[in-house]
Amino acid sequence: NTRTRKNLVRFFSDELASSGSNSDAKPVESMESIRASYGLFQHQMKAVNDLENRFTENSRLLLHMPTGSGKTRTAMSFLARYLSKRQTVVIWLAHNEELCEQAYSEFSRAWQAQGNRTLTSQRYWGQHEAHYTSLSDGLLVAGIQKFFGRIRDDSQAIYQLGERASLIIMDEAHQAIAPTYQSVLELLTILNSKDSRLLGLSATPGRTWNNFDEDRKLSEFFDRQKVTLTVDGYDNPVDYLT
């Protein structure tokens, strides 16, 4: 009835008035910014997306990003995405121990932030001896000189590993056209011919800026397929970095 409605209106009006008059009440936070623990800049995210898209049609790609643009971080984000979608083996090759350790540590940070399961990461350079014959899901970071030596001593072990590896990453990709390194890369990619990808990382387009023959060899080795750094609003991405 009318009296009941009036009493209800009065009751709730009094409640609202009393709750709004509490000047000591602390404001309630309704939103917050959540920072990514392994975030990327826009140009790095674009490069990762480009790699994913281009690998659907190509088996070899060269990622060319100038020094200071986050080449390793970009490659690790791509690698984390790649491993998140499949159980497989990835081999990361570098020509010195410093680059190997950098890659190993960086992958650990990337996978802890972006990974979706527990997997294995193994060292194989210097004094490290990896048990990669049992590796079926994870990353092997290897010094290419040691890797090449193992091929000569125990080629069967390398064959078994190569058959399980679906992605080979070569840091400092301009080294890839050296005869020793090239033979290792060719062997690993041939062993898993049905599902094998090769990614080279480079801060410079070739061994030198003016050696056309070396640039041509590098381009041909990666099937003339290259992903480069692009930054909106800059014709030359180096200008963005300086």
State each model region's role.
Residues S19-H64:
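Conserved pre-motif I regulatory segment
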Residues T88-V89, L135-L139, R164-L167, K194-L199:
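Loop/turn-to-beta-strand initiation segments
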Residues N96, A142-K146, L201-P205:
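A short beta-strand-to-loop transition that corresponds to the Sensor-1 phosphate-sensing loop
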Residues Q112-R152:
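Inter-Walker segment of RecA-like/P-loop motor cores
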Residues L139-I169, A176-V184:
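Conserved RecA-like ASCE ATPase "motif II neighborhood" in helicase/translocase motors
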Residues N1-E29:
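N-terminal accessory nucleic-acid engagement/regulatory domains that precede
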Residues Q175-T242:
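Post-DEXD/H (motif II) to motif III coupling segment of the RecA-like Helicase ATP-binding lobe
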Residues S69-S77, Y82-R109:
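Conserved Walker A/P-loop ATP-binding site and its immediately adjacent core
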